[in-house]
Amino acid sequence: GRGGKPVYIDLFHQQIGRALITGTSGSGKSVLGWRFALEALANNIPVVGMDISSSGNSTFKTAIELLGDQGAYYDISSGSSNLLEPPDLRRFDKLERERRMESWKDFIRRALSAIAMGKIHNPHLAQRVDALLIRALDVFLRDPEIITRYNRAFEMGWRSPEWQQIPTLPNFIKFCTRESLNLRSFEDLDRHALNQIQSQVGALLASRLGKAIARPSTFSPEPAIKFFALSGLTNEQDAYLMAINAHAACIRNALSHPRSLFI
């Protein structure tokens, strides 16, 4: 605190849950944040985080490297993080699984809406895109083949052949049709919205970002602390999409555990 007065914050044993650290560049924000991370690890609470480093130098990267196999620092632009990989909810009871799955679906729907709409400002179209994505996600996640592929991927684990068959964005986009969604009343706005989803997602899949967002994840789920880095992205739209994917990876990891620290 100012004037040399210490401030005691306990995120793990009191009902605080959140902390905001602000400061100018080089003021020690990351060092202070790292203290919370170490306390979480001491309490067997996994840590996930996003690190936006414009220079490529990172306090978090240096600290995580000192942890050896217990920590992992991933540059999300040099690997793949499957946007449609759900959290691993097998440790939870049915009610908690459903609650956490709904949280994940809500985030993915918002991420897909952002991809589909880009910089277009059209409230009516955005609303219809959102509604169709909700429906498409429900149909997709209830499809027997999709369910089987997800279950097999999690049963056999990361790096298994079954993991390479986990559903991804190209599988989802095939469900974004009038027939798959069983749209009996089909207005021009529906046609426009589906075309917007298909064209924007299709363009993404054809770009260099496609491999980073639409393939099975190449990041191990094992380390107790994982940071997803965003660096070297100069294009504003690319940076935005990669930030969405890094955020999705953090949300996925956080939802997979009863308690977690998200930095």
Question: Model regions: which residues?
Answer:
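Conserved lysine of the Walker
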Residues: 29
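Hydrophobic positions on the alpha1 helix immediately C-terminal to the Walker A/P-loop
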Residues: 32
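P-loop NTPase motor domains
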Residues: 1-7, 37, 42, 52-69, ...
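Basic- and hydrophobic-enriched, low-structure N-terminal and domain-boundary segments
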Residues: 1-22
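Walker A/P-loop nucleotide-binding motif
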Residues: 25-26
